[in-house]
Amino acid sequence: MPFIPNTDADRATMLQAVGASTFDDLISNIPEKVRFKGALNLPEALSEMEVLEELNALANANQDTQKVTSFLGGGAYDHFVPSAIGAIISRSEFYTAYTPYQAEVSQGTLQAMYEFQTMVARLTGMDVANASMYDGATALAEAMLLSVAHKNRKEVVLAGKINPNAVAIMQTYGHGQEIHIRQSALENGGADLASVRELVSDKTAAMIVQHPNFFGCLEDVHELQKIAAENNALFIVSADPISLGILEAPGNYGADIVVGEGQGLGNTQSFGGPYLGLFAAKSQLLRKIPGRLSGMTVDKDGNQGFILTLQTREQHIRREKATSNICTNQALNALCACIYMSMMGKEGLTQVASLSIQKAHYLANEIQKLDGFKLKFSRPFFKEFAIELPIPASQAIAKLLEKKIHAGVDLKMAEENGLLIAVTEKRSKAEMNSFVEALKELC
């Protein structure tokens, strides 16, 4: 049967409602010379079965992680997603990307948001977290805006290597407000402390560091925090939440704001999104936090309940008075993260982080044994590392894809030569050994 949305009777009713007798009457104000004439060059209609076959054939062209061993990173990682997550988020009570507009009617959704906020705050070592942002890059840009507004300064300093895509978002956000973004020099894949000291001043609203950074290297966050504090600038940390299963929580070393990409917490890579941004801060910044906050309260009868609270950040007030104009959140993705953290617990998250770091170092050591290959930097790293190789990274990526291996990210995007390799808890020793053998054959 043809899937036509409107019957002749439906169309007649709609035409009558707008005062037109025919479809030609409806479009009479469109000049004849620009109207399409003749038949559209479309294929014959297909049955449902034929459509599914066609779509499956198109989808099979994708080189997804069900078919290809992935060492891709740079912000999106192939972590394991427990099957229970898909089952729970598919329940009709949860399955929406939006926070309800009559929020207090949906107590279950608000409680899930509240639990998510609580776990993110504990994970980052901060006082308060919001109900999520659009993605990690957006969260970082919003943190920059908060710092500029809070300090009444128009300059931020990037210490070390931050994901170039996130920096591009920050530049877009900062352009209209004339925010000056200054980049420190790099030393061995991380922030050059002398350069940072030279850049940070009493004009600096915030120092921003990614830890682990874009190259996977660990930064000297304690020293960087001191430099920020000496100049009364906010200290903003962009963290991989999985790394916090084993690395010190940013709140413990003086971070004022912690942001991050939450995709690794129970969300699939999904060819780039949707993801969710994490945003946590000290209590002094509570009323300036962007996005939505779920809070716990009691009703007039003394019953515990949940509400959206402190809503002076978005569409509930005049645009020029709002501290942020992001008016929603990634509720469904945040729910995935909430379920993931609940299922894994502290020990589970620590195990995921430990396996990732152990496997990454095993692979790095094996690659260094190959002639012509070496680590690009000697700094400690978490689950990602950069290598130099004897041929252009783009060629290595193309050749290994023929062997069903996603070799990594070409560092050309970061204006560097080399290959960025990420290793998660999913990678087996056999997969890593096959990767090493494939690299060996390139020489």
Swiss-Prot record:
Descriptive protein name: Probable glycine dehydrogenase (decarboxylating) subunit 1
Keywords: Oxidoreductase
Disulphide-bridged cysteine pairs: none
GO terms assigned for molecular function: glycine dehydrogenase (decarboxylating) activity
Protein function: The glycine cleavage system catalyzes the degradation of glycine. The P protein binds the alpha-amino group of glycine through its pyridoxal phosphate cofactor; CO(2) is released and the remaining methylamine moiety is then transferred to the lipoamide cofactor of the H protein.
Highest taxon of source: Bacteria
Reaction(s) the record says it catalyses: N(6)-[(R)-lipoyl]-L-lysyl-[glycine-cleavage complex H protein] + glycine + H(+) = N(6)-[(R)-S(8)-aminomethyldihydrolipoyl]-L-lysyl-[glycine-cleavage complex H protein] + CO2
UniProt EC number: 1.4.4.2
PANTHER family recorded: GLYCINE CLEAVAGE SYSTEM P-PROTEIN, GLYCINE DEHYDROGENASE (DECARBOXYLATING)
Quaternary structure note: The glycine cleavage system is composed of four proteins: P, T, L and H. In this organism, the P 'protein' is a heterodimer of two subunits.
The keyword Cell cycle belongs to this UniProt entry's keyword annotation: no
Similarity section: Belongs to the GcvP family. N-terminal subunit subfamily.
One of the GO BP terms on file: nucleoside metabolic process
Signal peptide (from-to): none
Major enzyme class: oxidoreductase
